[in-house]
Amino acid sequence: MTEKTNLFPNLIRFRETNRLKMAIAASIMLWCATPQQAAADTYEKHEIASVQQQKVKTTGTVLDQNGEAMIGVSVKVKDNATMGAITDLEGKFSIDTPKGATLEISYIGYKTVTVKAEGTALNITMQEDAEVLDEVVIVGYGSQKKVNVTGAVSMVDSKVIESRPVSNVSQALQGVVPGLNLTVPTTGGALDAGMNISIRGAGTIGDGSSSSPLILIDGMEGDMNSINPNDIENISVLKDAAASSIYGSRAPFGVILITTKSGKAGRTSVNYSTNVRFKSPMSMPEMMDSWSFANYWNEAGINQNGNIKFTQDVMDKILAFQQGTLTGPDAAGISWQDGEWKKYAGAWANTDWFKEQYHSIVSNEHNISVNGGTDKVTYMVSAGYMGDKGLTRHGDDRLTRYNLSGKINATLSKYVKLMYNTKFIREDYDRPSYLTSNFYHNIARRWPTNPVKDANGYYLDHSEIIQMEEGGRDVTQKDQFYQQIQLVVEPLKDWLIHAEGNMKIVNNQNQWEVLPVYYHDGEGSPVAMAWFDGYTPGMSRVNQSYWKDNNYSLNLYTDYFKQIGDHYFKVMGGFNAELYKRTNLSGQRDELITPDVPTLNTGTTEQKANGGYSHWANAGFFGRINYNYKERYLLEINGRYDGSSRFIGDKRWGFFPSFSAGWNVSREPFWRDLEHIVNNFKIRGSWGELGNCNTTAFYPFYQTMPTGVENSGWLINGKKPNTASAPGIVSAEMTWETVRSWNIGFDFGLLNNRLTGSFDYFVRNTLDMIGPAPQLPATLGATVPKVNNADMKAWVLKWKFLGETVLKILIME
């Protein structure tokens, strides 16, 4: 008895069993029936409109490289999706087309074939597309064929990003990558607000710790919301410890790898694109009208103490206002009495504050790129402009972004290649200084009985409209400058040495203003009002700040490939170092000579200045071993020895390993009779351990002494003295949070990857999270320091089908 007969006695007769063959084919035809019928209906209409055009009937047969009939192959007229057909059970098709039309024959995993329709019988042989079958996935410090990946990795190409009318990359990734969670931050809909990003949920609740993934742009940490989405070639998301462990303590909760476009050899190509976006507020709360609002208030008052908030006279005016029967001064919805506007329970307008504060806008984007080169040198230069506006109606809220990038790849000799990459990004964000999170919060707290304007047509002081339009600006300019250079040397065949140097400089400058604001009394005269609680009416202030971030990183690594028969080996090892520096300076002054020139020099009070300097550094040695046998049995081992300046002594260094394995079941000989139905089936599993050094405090082991300049409550020799307080207590035992996780799952593809999906079961343990220590007696005289004293565990079960997550269960403790 043969191996096939032992394992699958019924499947060996698959090709000979007509009934089963017809059932499978019928299922495929049912899957394709709707678009086919739609195309046929449309074609009939097209035929009526073109009776005078000469038609020919073209028939043919489509076979694969082995001479097997291909079922469900798409046959359509080029540039006319309404005229098409699909091949039947025997690979045959028939289509009526204009004479001389070009036919496109296509199928997933095969190269598209184009032929002329001349009314003759065609015999088409489809060739497998090696680029599709050998799809490459970007991983840490290299790439792998997708079929050989054993970690949890998802990839997004440029077509997905370009098809979405969004202004930044995080918006483009929403709903695209399973397990990638993007949520709106507390800053709400601010134009410069990126998304809060996590992979497979929150990974830590440790004090000062972050569970955000590491984001690398062409191998260097960067802000993905600032780069031009049009410049992106692909994005890889490394989800589990096996995939991300090569990056060590900077990536305990995954990695997002962004690769930008490169030039292609050939004639110079110029591409231009423009986008016009129409944006409108969505999912706004439906607020009560003033009549319902007043009735609820009165009912609450009666239930509480027997008193009503709105008098019967005001209730009558509320109803009349909504009916549009009020005339004269009452039509304004408010009255001036006893030296003030009678707002809230004394007003009778009917205002929907969400509709008043929001409106629809139009934004635009322009992109141009030039690329080309020879077989020795290729280049890519691109530029982009994006002008975006906020949805707030009052106060101009706008963000402008300029992108300029260039990339050169050069083959210097048979053994040496050079890559140089540069980017410049400028973002100008100009908005009302009052446009803070409190603004969004307060909209829902506004009473609908208050009108927008008083009886004289001036804005009332109960809403933020006056502050938004007249209270000053918050202007930020952010410049990012990336410089990257890479040298690749191949001293021997299949042995590569990589040297990468990266530098990123970010310059930020901001001016934040408080300008005098005024409402108007019953006679239309201006009256100074407080800009915000705690501010003196009529006061003014200007704050100017500047900060500069310098990031430097060095990557030195080497890899070696070796194939012995059906055994494939790849070994990689290297060194990584990072240095981050920040310098900041700010100044503030009040009581401007004139609000028309809001600068520090035009302030009249004592000038306040502040500044600082901080930095951190990381270093790590890493290695990886890959092995596969006939791309059937897969093994990967990673290790990284990491050091961080954020810890001290023997706590500074840590070793973090990971292991993963996979089995490509669909590459087994016994699977051949199933491969035209289930063409891909891979089982995989991984385990890994990573440290987390992403703490808020750069040096939590240092004692600090709070200081103050002339802030004492008494005088010495006629002056307020400088002060210094006792230092806090620190924990010398503070060390890494440790993230330990394992993942099992499988990937599958049906009908030559027409239908794809995956299943994952994932467990993550976060150990030694930083939290408060047990309280000590107050006689200690200081705050108890933070220590490593908390753990968290998460289970995730996820099922993905056709690129969509159809089931996700998350349990945390």
Residue ranges and their predicted role:
Residues 1-404, 417-419, 482:
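Short, small/polar-rich motifs associated with maturation and membrane association
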Residues 94-95, 110, 118, 206, ...:
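Short, intrinsically disordered/low-complexity patches at protein termini
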Residues 97-103, 115-124, 218-232, 428-468, ...:
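Generic structural signal for short, solvent-exposed loop/turn connectors between secondary structure elements
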Residues 161, 211-212, 407-426, 460-514, ...:
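Extracellular/periplasmic, surface-exposed regions of secreted and cell-surface proteins
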Residues 232, 383-385, 517-534, 775-776:
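A short glycine/small-residue-enriched secondary-structure motif
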Residues 368-372, 452, 562:
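Short acidic-hydrophobic surface loop/beta-edge motif
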